[in-house]
Each structure stands twice: as structure tokens, then as C-alpha cells.
Amino acid sequence: MVSDNRWVATTKGIVVFLLTALLFVFWYDRDRELAESHVTAVRFGFYRVIWIEVLCGITVAWCVRKKFRFRLPDAGVLLLGGYVLLRSVYGDGMVGYRTEFWILFVILYFLLRLLSSLFRNAVTVMLWTLMGAGLVETIYGFGQLYGRFASGHSLYRLTGSFFNPGPYSGFLVMVLPVVLFYCLSVYPGRQKSGGEWRYKLESGFVWGILLLILSILPAGMSRSSWLAAVAGCGVVTAFYYRIRKQLKELGRKLGKKAWWVAGIGVVCLLLLFSGLYLMKKDSADGRRLMWKIAGRAIAENPWGGCGLGYFGGAFGKAQAAYFATEEATEQEEWVAGSPEYGFNEYLQLGVELGIVGSILFLLAVGLAVRQLLYSSRPEKGAVLGGLTAFSVFACFSYPLSVIPLVIVFVLFMALAGTLDDRKLPAEERKRTVGAWFVMGASLLMAGITWRLTQHKEEWKQAYIRWGEEQRYFSMDIFEETVDHYRDLYPFLKDQPKFLFEYGQCLSKTGQYEEGIRILTEGTRLSADPMFYNIMGKDAEALKHFGQAEACFKQASYMVPHRLYPLYLLAKMYFESGQSEKGRDMARQVIQKAPKVMSDAVKEMKAELKERLQP
């Protein structure tokens, strides 16, 4: 009987390990034929993996037939997922694949809840698997630094399996608190339960990962990841050493001197933040401007937001309106850009899902933290540290837009819902649902997953064809390319880069009105002022000079330090017979200092100088 129980436990452990490991390996398979492969390959890989996870979840539910303890974090996740679903059906519109991913991540959450509830050590197996994924990423990163592996971005040497150093550093700092927890927890006393060899193996494994992560993290040059690492590891250390209790005792011993010690600590923190700010001052000022503009975008549609996927368009319009008021400083004009992300997930959620969506997201995370604080399991420190690192990193970056980082976040949320809750009130601990309900729910999740992932092969083929057509687009072969882009439009109309290329093809082939329509759709998705530049040129070709002027001015307001929109506006004035306006605008362009002096800028200024000559 004992051997049978051990065999069952081993089988469960292998199942949990394999299904967890699958979530951390699929993004290494890069299909280079896909357009935007650094993003789309991961997306289509996730579609395949979630199917495997769901089918295995159904099998586990039917084989084990175990009751499921429904907890408050589960309710928080359901509320958030339900709101996204209702918002997509009854709201102003959402980008389809973004809504699908939110729903699929809710399904993944409950699958991981089921897996982590299979047996008591399931949580430990999942956390060790996560650390293994962190080890692989650090080895991959060192391989890139030493030229053994190719980088995921031409401008950066270190990206891991990601497309730039930011998400790579974010992944490592979410793993780091878990590694630190086990470094503190693996001690010689473990020899009694597993022998000296097990202690040495575990100790060497976790300490090796810790040293590797700490060695490579500075090379990523991500200040947000450093802050997240300090916060996450600080939480783990505080829980392990019960620092709160020790600080109280220290305060009693120091008496009034404690205030001086606290003051010195605050000054040190201020100096630290000042150093981080001065390290990349323009970048920090740019983030601050983005947050200000995001706040203005939230004010435009405070409760429901603009819809998932439409952050770029809402941000671009809000930034143009801000610079049009002439309230901005010269530094703000200098650092303004056209970001794809808000670099603060809480503000971006506010822009896309409104205040209601932001509150529901914070509620779900807050309920998970509450569950951890009530837990009596020691692993709560590791999970809470990981959630803390994610939460801090989300203040300065875009982890909810990177599928691997969302998977780690969902894993932490699921583990928080699973960990033992003996300290909770009795009425909360008794909330369970029967095995038949679990099996029915697993079938429902399978049906939803099938509905959301069917026909994705057609979408994948569309991305492959787009990648092929981009070669002809780059060679300025527009006549045939425009017809192929028209065929791809139903599949790729939520991709701003595709809409921009399609709009340009239409413009180059003289289809100006249709080009304006396609580019206008792109302005809902992107903050790139080039959409308005091309629309302005199309309107000018149609002799709609008032519309062209409005487009060029909008592009100029969106990113004020760029000269190209003003150059186009000056040319349009001259071509339309508005010579006086043209001369005024030409002088403005000639006198304006560009952010980066290039041959193109010199040519534009030289051309306008010729226009000014009598």
C-alpha cells in the first residue's frame, strides 16, 4: 500500500512538472516565416500549448475526481474575466486577440489551480520548475553575451529568449524571489529527510541560479527590474527573518534614536532613486510624460476605457491635445515619443478598461495577497515575493503585454489561491465544490478554448503571407502587393504595422480615399504620427488642403520634436498657393533644432531654404 501511494504521488509529480514546464518552453520555438515573429510566434505557440493544458486538465479532473475548494482569489479572477467578456460584447469594441488572451489566461489560472491542488507538494514542484526555467534563461543570456547565441533584437546584445532586455530582466526578477526563498530554506537539517546528497544538490542548484541571475541582471540595464528585484527579495527576507518583529524590538531599544535611523534610511533611498533617475534622465522624463498623458487619456473615457488594444490610439490623441495647448515644457517636447505601451500597467489598464477594470484587477491581486498572508505554508514567502516583484515591475514596464511574463504572473496567482489557509475564518475554508462540478467546469473550459482557438491556422498562414509580401513592399513593388494586402486585411486589420503598410500601398497606387480609410483605422491602434503624415499626403493629392493641413498639424502635435510633419505642411502650403504660410512654416522648420541630425533632416532644410530664395 505504501509503495502504491508513493507511485501515485510520483505520477502526480511528473504530471505537474511536465505541464508546468510546457508553459516555459514553447516560446523558444520561433517560426521565422511569420511576420513580426518575435511576437506572433509566441502567440501561436500559446494557442497550441493551452489546448494541451486544457485536455490534460480534463483528464486529471476525470481521473482524480477531487473536490475543489473555491476561494476569494478565484472569485476575483472570475469577476475580472467576466468584466472583460462583457466589455468586449457590449462596449465600444476591443481588439479580438487581446480579449481572447485575457479569457484564455483566466482558463489557465483555473487549470493551474487544479494542478497545484493535486497533492501537497505540487506547489513545490511548480516553483522548482519555474526556477529551472530561470536557470535556462540565464544560461541563454550568458551565451548571448559571449556570442554563442543570437540576440532577439539587432540593437541589443542581451535579450534571452525575449525580443529586448526589458521583458528578459522582468522574467528573471520574478524568478529571483523564489530562488532567494529556497536559498534561505535549504539548510543542512534537510539531510534528515533526504540525505546529504539531496541537501548538496538542492543547495548547489538554488545558489547557482541566484548567483547567475545576480550576475546577469545588471547587464540588462533595466532600472525597473532592479527596483522589482529589491522589492521582491525584500519581502522574502522580511517573511523569513520576521523583520517586522525585529524592527519593533530595535525601535524599543533605540527609543528616540529610531527616528534618526529612519531618517537616514529615507535619505539613502532618495539618493538611490536620484541616481537611478540621473542614469537615464531623458528616459525617466519620458516615462513621467507618458504617465501624465495616460492620465489625460483615462479622463477622456474614465469608466469603460477605450477597449483592449486601443491604448496607442487613445494615447496619441491625448498627447496631441496636450501639446496643442502649449502647456508642455521644452523637456517634455524633447522626450515625447509614440509608445506602443504605457510603461505602467495600472495606467494602461485604466486607459483600456477604465477605472472599473483597474479596480477589478487590483481586487484580484489584493485577494491573492490576502490569501497568502493568511496561509501557514512557508512557500507563501516565495509566491508573495514573486507577486511583489511583478507588481513593482508593472509600475514601470509592460509585463501584461508579454505572454511569458503573464504566464508567470498567472502561476503566482494560482499558487496564492491554492496555498493552505488554516488561519482564515472557518466559513471561508468550507467553501468547496463537488468533483462532478469540477469535471463539468473542465468541459466548459475546453469548449471555450476550442471556440477561441479554432481557425487559428488560417490566421497563422495570413501572417506567413504577410511576411512574404513585406519583401516586395520593401522593394517598392506596390501594384501587385496592394491586392495581396487587400486579401489579408480581414485577418490582420488589428495590426497597426500591417494597416500602415497597406495604407502606403494604396497611396502609392493612387487609391487615396481608400488609403485614408485604412490609415484612419490605424490611428485607433497606434500613436505613430506617420499615419497622419501619409493621410495628409493622400488628402493633398485629392486637393483636400484643409484636411491635409489638419493631418500634418496633428502629426506635429503628437511628437513635437519631429520636423517631417512641418516639412510636409510647408510643402503643401507652397503647392496649394498659400505662399505666405509656406514661407513662415519653412522658416520655422529651418530654425528648429532636430533631436537627431541626419542626412534626411539636412535635405529637408536645404530644400526649404531654396524655396525661400527669391
Where are these regions (language model features)?
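Alpha-helical transmembrane segments of multi-pass inner-membrane proteins
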Residues: K12-W27, R48-A61, V77, G81-L111, ...
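Interfacial juxtamembrane loops and adjacent helix segments
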Residues: G152-Y156, L308-V351
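Hydrophobic alpha-helical transmembrane segments in integral membrane proteins
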Residues: F273-L289, V438-M475
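Alpha-solenoid helical repeat scaffolds
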Residues: W466, K497-E501, M530-M535, Y564-L568, ...
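Conserved structural position within tetratricopeptide repeats
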Residues: Y489-P490, E521-R524, K553-Y557, Q591
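Short coil turns that delineate tetratricopeptide repeat
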Residues: K493-D494, S526-A527, P560, P594
